[in-house]
């Protein structure tokens, strides 16, 4: 059985085609900078063949046409026609109150997904467009919606409710939902294997640090609390997102800058975070260069980011009763940036959480798992590359093979 996973971004399309029997990857790739004249297609085949092509891809529809050309390319020998693909799993950022688990795509679920898109206007609408196109391109494939919010369905009301009028929650579903759930699900299972401990016995703090970042407290193998909220804007300092702020800033800056609240929200999402503080870049690699050159704002950006992470780790240690099995760093920054890991855990050695500097310094490869805890550390500190696609694959396979 061949299953395709699709991860749609606002200007990108990430895909992996699996042969499910042994989770063999037949081809994977990304189509980046969609809607620009500098679009990039990167693919990697099962034989390790890497290709990079520059094209002008005007839309996600055109990107999907390119995907079909890649999959049916006779030289690559992946598939002969689209009907060979029996299942497609879509990563959906926001499932709102409607979707507690991954679900089969049908008329009803697509309709419900459209209704909740107002909760994620930056993410869900473009994913829906891609879904509607894939329904035409792959008419015979069963398709599945896999939600980043579903993992957090186990949070208690005291963790997910805001202290706003209760009617906002009951009437408008205003609450914390959390994100990066596909990643947290994979990491939790992986840690259970690494530590040789039942998943339901695990207490973890997982840091998904990338251009978008969040942190998850896992209690007895289930999501207990998380930093992102109603939207992915809440929580940690991110590449271009502010993370936690005083909400009164929005009407104040709207007045001072003579801009609409919607425009201020856009600034908080796209021009803030590391980019906003550093005055340089949303890319931490560029900011570290600034630190080396003694640039004040670059140093400040790194300090603010690490300080916010440290505060969240401390608070999650408290809600987990200071009883945790491991702290895990994952995603692009979490796996490669030893400096942020060191700063984020500085001081925790006093309560038995200690990094080994040499191991930490060596853990920079985005594909390699590492144990960076010192011999004295009472808590494991692990670096584990995430694999959201594998979570999508498993959920898709389980749903499309389930007896009706």
Curated annotation (Swiss-Prot):
Transition state stabilizer, annotated site positions: 180, 241
Main EC class the enzyme belongs to: transferase
Entry keyword 4Fe-4S: no
Cofactor(s) essential for the protein: Mg(2+); Mn(2+)
GO MF assignments: acetate kinase activity; ATP binding; magnesium ion binding
Catalytic activities: acetate + ATP = acetyl phosphate + ADP
Subunit comment: Homodimer.
Protein name: Acetate kinase
